[in-house]
Structure formats: structure tokens, C-alpha cells
């Protein structure tokens, strides 16, 4: 089944490629796997790029129907992501939400503590780039629980749909599916790997000479997903 693309999702994929955030080729991951693509949200590194990125996060939130009282960005990459998402929600969706982030180490002086910005109260929506192992999300859940708040969900840029590995081999679920199962909360992504693949296949079918190399990238991503990934419903 072809993954359906909303117009904003197609624009996001093109934006990520143009900014050098989404690359195709051969990349060795920390796990030792050779991936046919690489996604590094840290390369959204200009004011204009970050502002536009926030609008994509805001569109994903609006499209998902998720409701929240506070946005939270896990240190470090999540900090600018939550900030730009809060600005975009206020400017483009008339939703003026407070936001917060954590310090890696609690401050002993001044007000102290490890939360900066708004108090964690009510429904907290976590904003991050990707979920690889789920470790950062589990740490955030401890902060949310300690504050007496509840997690409304997680919003990320890309769902890699990739299964981790343990001593028994490939896990049955992706890291995102594990987080969803463990905490019973939704994880929303601007795009999924299936949608990136659908985008490549669409470009390839248009037959532009400049897009001929996309065929091999699409084939490589499909093979990688079939080996290490999970299929999503719908």
C-alpha cells in the first residue's frame, strides 16, 4: 500500500533534502547497520530554516488533532524544536501554548531545578527530532510523572520505522511502537519512512532525467525497510 502524502509532508521532504538534512547514499549507523539514507535535524541551522521547520511541526500537530497544555523539548535537540513549534502554533494556528525544556544537570543556585520555562502541568506534548532507542523519551516521562503531569504524546520529524536489536536479535517492534505500547500515548511524525519512499517513487515515475538516481535510492530504502523495519497500518 502506498503511503499517502499530505501537501505539507511532500514540502517537508523537499525542504529536508534541500537543507541537507535528509541524504541518500550509504551511511554507517551507530548500530553498525549500513543505511541507504541519513536524517540529521541538527542541520536545520539557520533562522529561516528553523522558522519553517516549526511550521511543519505545527501542521503535524494540527493535522493529528492532539491537544496539549504545554510543549516540552528534551535537551538538547528538542529545545529549539519546542521553541520554534510554540512560535508557529501561535503565529499560524492561534494556539498560544507555553513551552519548557530540561537541563542535563540540575542547577544548584538561583531557582534551581532542571526544568526551564513553563511548569510541567496538565497535558505535556513532547517535541523531538527522531526516536531511535526511546531512551530520551523514557527520561522525559520520569520528569513528567515527577511533576504530576501527563504526557499528551510525542511529535517527531521522521518515523524511521526501524527495529532495534538485543541479544536475541531483531526486536519485534520499532522504538516508536515500544514507546506507544509502554506509555499508551500517540507518537506523531511529520513524515514516515514509508512516505519518504512514496515521495521518491512519485518523483521517479515522473521520469525527469535529474531524478533517475532516485530509483536506486528507492530500491535501497525499500530493501532496508524490509530487512530492519516495520510496516505501518494505513
Swiss-Prot record:
Binding annotation for 5-phospho-alpha-D-ribose 1-diphosphate: 30, 76-77, 103-104, 107, 109, 128-136
Gene3D superfamilies with a match to the protein in the record: 3.40.50.2020
CC terms in the record's Gene Ontology section: cytoplasm
Cofactor(s) the protein needs: Mg(2+)
Pathway(s) served: Pyrimidine metabolism; UMP biosynthesis via de novo pathway; UMP from orotate: step 1/2
Assigned keywords, A-Z: Glycosyltransferase, Magnesium, Pyrimidine biosynthesis, Transferase
Top-level lineage group: Bacteria
Known EC number: 2.4.2.10
Cysteines engaged in disulfide bonds, as pairs: none
PROSITE patterns cross-referenced by the UniProt entry: PUR_PYR_PR_TRANSFER
GO MF annotation: an example: orotate phosphoribosyltransferase activity
Catalyses which reaction(s): orotidine 5'-phosphate + diphosphate = orotate + 5-phospho-alpha-D-ribose 1-diphosphate
Binding residues annotated for orotate, in chain numbering: 38-39, 132, 160
UniProt cross-references to PANTHER family, sorted A to Z: OROTATE PHOSPHORIBOSYLTRANSFERASE 1-RELATED (PTHR46683:SF1)
Record's subunit section: Homodimer.
Protein family membership: Belongs to the purine/pyrimidine phosphoribosyltransferase family. PyrE subfamily.
Function: Catalyzes the transfer of a ribosyl phosphate group from 5-phosphoribose 1-diphosphate to orotate, leading to the formation of orotidine monophosphate (OMP).
Name the UniProt record assigns to this protein: Orotate phosphoribosyltransferase
Amino acid at each position: 500500500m502506498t503511503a499517502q502524502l499530505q501537501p505539507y509532508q511532500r514540502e517537508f521532504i523537499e525542504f529536508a533534502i534541500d537543507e541537507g538534512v535528509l541524504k541518500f547514499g550509504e551511511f554507517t549507523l551507530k548500530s553498525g547497520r549500513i543505511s541507504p539514507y541519513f536524517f540529521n535535524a541538527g542541520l536545520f541551522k539557520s533562522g529561516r530554516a528553523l522558522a519553517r521547520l516549526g511550521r511543519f511541526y505545527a501542521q503535524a500537530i494540527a493535522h493529528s488533532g492532539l491537544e496539549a497544555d504545554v510543549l516540552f523539548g528534551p535537551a538538547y535537540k528538542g529545545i529549539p524544536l519546542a521553541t520554534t513549534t510554540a512560535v508557529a502554533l501561535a503565529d499560524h494556528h492561534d494556539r498560544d501554548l507555553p513551552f519548557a525544556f530540561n537541563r542535563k544537570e540540575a542547577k544548584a543556585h538561583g531557582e534551581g531545578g532542571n526544568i526551564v520555562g513553563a511548569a510541567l502541568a496538565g497535558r505535556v506534548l513532547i517535541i523531538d527530532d527522531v526516536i531511535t532507542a526511546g531512551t530520551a523519551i523514557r527520561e522525559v516521562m520520569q520528569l513528567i510523572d515527577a511533576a504530576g503531569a501527563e504526557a499528551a504524546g510525542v511529535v517527531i520529524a521522521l518515523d524511521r520505522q526501524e527495529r532495534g536489536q538485543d541479544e536475541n536479535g531483531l526486536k519485534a517492534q520499532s522504538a516508536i511502537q515500544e514507546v506507544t505500547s509502554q506509555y499508551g500515548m500517540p507518537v506523531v511524525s511529520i513524515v514516515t519512512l514509508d512516505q519518504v519512499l512514496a515521495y521518491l517513487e512519485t518523483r521517479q515515475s515522473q521520469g525527469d532525467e535529474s531524478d533517475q538516481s532516485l530509483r536506486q535510492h528507492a530500491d535501497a530504502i525499500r530493501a532496508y525497510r524490509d530487512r530492519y523495519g516495520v510496516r505501518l497500518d494505513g
